A protein has these predicted regions:
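Nucleotide-activated sugar donor-binding and catalytic core shared by glycosyltransferases
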Residues: 1-164
Length: 164
């Protein structure tokens, strides 16, 4: 509860920002997080809560926003593709390869606010505009199928009999 309140306390200061929350993952404590977010949304008119945006709407959403904040892998894997900022909270994604658009921060109000200031500077987006996207450029399934078709599968799929 302390962590979600740190986050919400920081977000409360972003009066000129539109804030959209989506359902927290199935992690321990998600009911508390959801409850606190719903309370926040009731008293902060610049914020909204949606259970889910759905896949198509979610990617359309990522294209439109300036940043996302949270500890979801989406901020590490998908958001950099759109050349947008991710404020990655805590250590849940620790050890993953991250783009320059990802800012790893502690779940502390002041750290969160400093990060929002950092991404509001024009230099931040100039820097990430040409940053490398580490997770490919799409089309992996087509490349996989192409490789599988080249394999000599006569022996590959043959079951072996073991006499016990």
């Amino acid at each position: 509860k302390k962590q979600i309140n740190e986050i919400l306390s920081a977000l409360k200061e972003l009066k000129d920002s539109l804030i959209i929350f989506t359902m927290p993952g199935a992690d321990l404590g998600n009911k508390i997080i959801k409850k606190e977010i719903k309370k926040f949304v009731k008293i902060n008119k610049n914020s909204f809560f949606r259970e889910s945006l759905g896949q198509v709407n979610y990617f359309s959403f990522l294209r439109q926003v300036d940043a996302i904040i949270g500890n979801s892998s989406s901020g590490i894997l998908e958001m950099p593709y759109f050349k947008k900022a991710t404020l990655n909270l805590g250590n849940r994604q620790l050890g993953r390869l991250c783009s320059q658009s990802v800012i790893n921060i502690k779940i502390k109000k002041n750290d969160i606010l400093k990060s929002f200031k950092k991404i509001s500077l024009p230099n931040f987006y100039k820097r990430i505009k040409n940053s490398k996207f580490f997770y490919g450029n799409g089309g992996s399934s087509k490349r996989i199928v192409k490789i599988l078709r080249k394999l000599d599968n006569k022996n590959l799929f043959q079951k072996k009999f073991f006499n016990i």
